[in-house]
Amino acid sequence: MPTLLELSSVLPLAELEVGQHFYWQIGNYRLHGQVFLTSWFVIAALVVLSLLANRNLQRIPSGLQNFMEYVLDFIRNLARTQIGEKEYRPWVPFIGTLFLFIFLSNWSGALIPWKLIKLPSGELAAPTSDINTTVALALLTSLAYFYAGFSRKGLGYFGNYVHPTPVMLPFKILEDFTKPLSLSFRLFGNILADELVVAVLVLLVPLFVPLPAMILGLFTSAIQALIFATLAASYIGEAVEEHGEEHAE
């Protein structure tokens, strides 16, 4: 009698395909090559921006240095508000990386004509319009807040699951599964829907009518990056917060 593992290798339990894909075959694994290509582009753009902003540091910032310091202050304030005054500093790089990567990924889908770049198969698109990217970001967030809780409280972190009453245990466990699901599908759905709407409008009315939708897409993309980073910081704040302790104002 075949085992469950053997059946799952023959009959996939679930398969999600949206659009055409460019695959890289590495052994028995098949990777979404177009996601890696666009993700590397976004990462390279962030590295170049960071190097340019730090190339000639001045005591009184101006130009790109001034802009990057403003972004850093914004991310620092976001982390402080959600995590708390005592614990936020170690998490600023993580929250900042999430926000900047998602923000630039979303905007790359709205501003860069990826589909004009021809591939052997499939087509390029924003990294965050692929469910694999958003699920990976959500799982990283889950690992981050688990690590934050354990590093702060040790085994006492499990006390959160039965606070304020043991009746909450199944709901707390369910919450650990729904958090990454909601994070990943919210981001994936919004960015993919925006790209599809703009693509359809461009095909139907290829002149100026799609412009308002594209501008709205830029705004939505920025909001989605902010929501993801805010929720990630909030989950970390919940993990490190002691019972009865409130975030600093």
Swiss-Prot record:
Record keyword Isomerase present: no
* Transmembrane stretches, start-end: 33-53, 92-112, 131-151, 196-216, 217-237
Extract the Gene3D superfamilies matched here: ATP synthase, F0 complex, subunit A
Tell me the compartments it is located in.
Answer: Cellular thylakoid membrane
Q: Which domain of life is it from?
A: Bacteria
Q: How does it sit in the membrane?
A: Multi-pass membrane protein
What Pfam families does its record include?
A: ATP-synt_A
**What is any one of the record's Gene Ontology cellular component terms?**
proton-transporting ATP synthase complex
Q: Which InterPro entries match?
A: ATP_syn_F0_a_bact/chloroplast, ATP_synth_F0_asu, ATP_synth_F0_asu_AS, F0_ATP_A_sf
Provide the family line: Belongs to the ATPase A chain family.
> Which function does this protein serve?
Key component of the proton channel; it plays a direct role in the translocation of protons across the membrane.
Name recorded for this polypeptide: ATP synthase subunit a
- What organism does the UniProt record list as the source? Synechococcus elongatus (strain ATCC 33912 / PCC 7942 / FACHB-805) (Anacystis nidulans R2)
Q: Which gene encodes it?
A: atpB
